[in-house]
Amino acid sequence: MKWSELSIHTTHEAVEPISNILHEAGASGVVIEDPLDLIKERENVYGEIYQLDPNDYPDEGVIVKAYLPVNSFLGETVDGIKETINNLLLYNIDLGRNHITISEVNEEEWATAWKKYYHPVKISEKFTIVPTWEEYTPVHTDELIIEMDPGMAFGTGTHPTTVLCIQALERFVQKGDKVIDVGTGSGILSIAAAMLEAESVHAYDLDPVAVESARLNLKLNKVSDIAQVKQNNLLDGIEGEHDVIVANILAEVILRFTSQAYSLLKEGGHFITSGIIGHKKQEVKEALEQAGFTIVEILSMEDWVSIIAKK
C-alpha cells in the first residue's frame, strides 16, 4: 500500500490544532519536528531519554508530518486540510510559513518513519510517557507510567501545554478529588488525574474522534473505572461541585467558560488552564480574575503558558 507524507511548515502556536486537523482527516501517525526538542534535551532534566538526530529537525519553525493513504479521495482530503488550516487564522493563530509539501512513501517506510521520533519521556517528578511498542522499566518505585500510541489521534502528551498541565495536576490533585477535563483530546490529563487517585474524572470533548481516542487510552491505561469520557460542548449542562477543572485548549476557547468553571468548583478548588500562547496570557488572566478567581501561579515552557487559578 502507498502512503502520502504531508509535511506542513508552521509555528509552535499552530502545532496542536494542525495535528488535530490531520488526525480528523484520517491521518495514521503524526510526526512533530520541533528544533526546541534538541535544546530541551540538553537543558531540561525532564528531556528525552534517547538521543535525537539534529538532521531530523528544521532550522526554524516546526514541521508537522502526517501519513495519509493514497486513494482516489486524496486530493479532496488534502484540499480540505488546507482549507481547515487556513481557517485557524480566524482564531488569530499564527501559521508562519504554512508551506505544505506532499511526497509518497511505501508501506514499510511508513511503518517505521514516524516511530523513530517517539521514545519514553519523563515529563514530571512522577510521570513518564511511554509509546505502546517500547519496553520500559521504571527507574523509581513511585514512577507512574502512561502508555500512549502516537498513531492514535491527538498526540503523545509531550507537547509543552500537556506537560505543564500534568505537572500542575501532580501538585493540586489530591486523593479522593473530583476532576473535570475539558476538551480532553487523547484523554491523557484524565489518565494522569486517575493515577493520582482522584475519586472520579469526567472528561468531555465535542469531537467524536477525540471521545473515541480518549476512551481507548483510558482502557489502555486501566483507569476506565475512575475516568469516563463523553461528547459535550465544553461545560454546557454540567452540574455538581468539583475539586479540580483542567483545560488544555486554545486561549480563545478558555475565555468562553471561565464563569462556568468558577460555578462548578468547590470553594478552594483549582482551575488549571493551558494551551495559552504567551502573548495571550494577560487576556486569559484578566478573564479569570473577572470571573472571581484568584491567580495562584503562572507557569511557562517555551512559548506556552499555564495559569493556575483558585476559587
From Swiss-Prot:
Where in the cell is the protein located?
Cytoplasm
The protein's annotated catalytic reaction(s) are:
L-lysyl-[protein] + 3 S-adenosyl-L-methionine = N(6),N(6),N(6)-trimethyl-L-lysyl-[protein] + 3 S-adenosyl-L-homocysteine + 3 H(+)
Q: Which Pfam families match?
A: PrmA
List the keywords (alphabetical).
Cytoplasm, Methyltransferase, S-adenosyl-L-methionine, Transferase
Q: Please tell me where S-adenosyl-L-methionine binds in this chain.
A: T162, G183, D205, N248
Please name the GO terms of the biological process aspect recorded for this protein, alphabetically: methylation
What EC number(s) would the UniProt record show? 2.1.1.-
InterPro entries assigned: Ribosomal_L11_MeTrfase_PrmA, Ribosomal_PrmA_MeTrfase, SAM-dependent_MTases_sf
Which Gene Ontology terms of cellular component type are present? cytoplasm
Q: Which CDD domains match?
A: AdoMet_MTases
One term of GO molecular function: protein-lysine N-methyltransferase activity
The reply to whether Methyltransferase figures as a keyword in the UniProt entry is yes
Q: Out of the domains of life, which is the source?
A: Bacteria
Per its UniProt record, what HAMAP family does this chain match? Methyltr_PrmA
Family membership noted in the UniProt record: Belongs to the methyltransferase superfamily. PrmA family.
Q: What is the stated purpose of this protein?
A: Methylates ribosomal protein L11.
Q: What is this protein called?
A: Ribosomal protein L11 methyltransferase
Q: Which organism is it from?
A: Bacillus subtilis (strain 168)
Per UniProt, what is the name of the gene that codes for the protein in this document? prmA
